[in-house]
Curated annotation (Swiss-Prot):
Transmembrane segments: none annotated. It holds the Pfam family AA_kinase. Pathway: Pyrimidine metabolism; CTP biosynthesis via de novo pathway; UDP from UMP (UMPK route): step 1/1. It catalyses: UMP + ATP = UDP + ADP. Inhibited by UTP. One of its GO terms (biological process) is UDP biosynthetic process. The lineage of its organism: Bacteria, Bacillati, Actinomycetota, Actinomycetes, Mycobacteriales. It is found in: Cytoplasm. It comes from Mycolicibacterium paratuberculosis (strain ATCC BAA-968 / K-10). UMP binds at residues 81, 101, 162-169. ATP binds at residues 40-43, 82, 86, 195, 198. Its EC number is 2.7.4.22. This is Uridylate kinase. HAMAP family: PyrH_B (MF_01220_B). Keywords: ATP-binding, Cytoplasm, Kinase, Nucleotide-binding, Pyrimidine biosynthesis, Transferase.
Amino acid sequence: MTESREPHVAGSAAPRPEPANGLASGQPSSRARYSRVLLKLGGEMFGGGQVGLDPDVVAQVARQIAEVVRGGVQVAVVIGGGNFFRGAQLQQRGMERTRSDYMGMLGTVMNSLALQDFLEKEGIVTRVQTAITMGQVAEPYLPLRAVRHLEKGRVVIFGAGMGLPYFSTDTTAAQRALEIGAEVVLMAKAVDGVFSADPRQYPEAELITAISHREVIDRGLRVADATAFSLCMDNGMPILVFNLLTNGNIARAVGGEKIGTLVTT
């Protein structure tokens, strides 16, 4: 029986030819330490410190991702929505938390579509899957289909968080990484890694190059929410926290170079 064609999503960019070389179809280069990764991007960085999108930042991130995909690494992405909305902050201003969280989820979809556009400008075939059905712009979240896309050398971007209020996109990244069989969560930040204290308030704070999930939780180090770290700890999923603003750091992280902070069980 011939394989059925995947439906074209209305409103998305015209499909581009699939990569023809072996590396781009999912066979990692010898320089890559990891073959399948989940990249977590903070929404605030997409705004360049402002509300909305900074196209220059999104383009730079897309170029970094394209570099590792061309090397054969399978890349899935979860993006926050903090450049548009933060549910917890809106709640503090009097908005009902559930509704404000859903607004935040819509912000992550806007970021996902923007990244998809810039990745496809780089020639990288990309799919967006959302936890809330949005058939005009994205596929529904289906882990088996996501894995199939990755095996074909496509980037998969997961939007709308978990589709549930009270869950952060950090927790979404941990859950999606486990479900698609990623080897590591690459947590991209605007700082060099995990520090002994907030380096913006304490210039003498020291970078921690290696630490356990348990110690991060026990010391209350504010890198990601405790639920995400607990989920990774319980399932042996390593997290690499690194600075996205240093050009080429995604490739360095995938290649196993000693950058940032490696969090292991």
